[in-house]
């Protein structure tokens, strides 16, 4: 993924007046961070939606302020939307220090083909969609890539301890947790249940005696 950038401008409108900004296709934004005074800004709503779609919560965004000569690196921290209509109401960015390690949820991406998955009767088990990674901001991988071609036998399991990340990035999840495996699908064959005929009720003694007495009288 190429670098993600977003242009921001100073905001002079606050509180309930922000609805007039939204009507013009502008969304209120805040930047905050460790040792940083919160900045009230605004962004083009369409550009902001595109940034959210591309960056999620795990990719760094280069924020470009027209009043700043420097580019600020930040994560999307919080997104507020209208509870019914779903449009953007507000977005918070958290500016980070490029010299300090950060922690982020990085998505897992599977690619390639497994010889076993081409065959019928096998399935991929992958309990995780994201893993927790710690690294310097510029060393955070955009995704954790797993090649499916390595799964060439049912005995092949991939654990967190088997994944090697570039640079100084490291996975914080427990190393012995299973990340992926290809296993056989075992179909459960159910034995059909044979319906049994209801038993005829036994003749009551009183009724039998009554029939015998009637027969003798005749």
Curated annotation (Swiss-Prot):
It comes from the Bacteria. GO terms for cellular component: cytosolic large ribosomal subunit. This is Large ribosomal subunit protein bL25. GO terms for molecular function: 5S rRNA binding; structural constituent of ribosome. The keyword Transport does not apply. One of its GO terms (biological process) is translation. Pfam families: Ribosomal_L25p, Ribosomal_TL5_C.
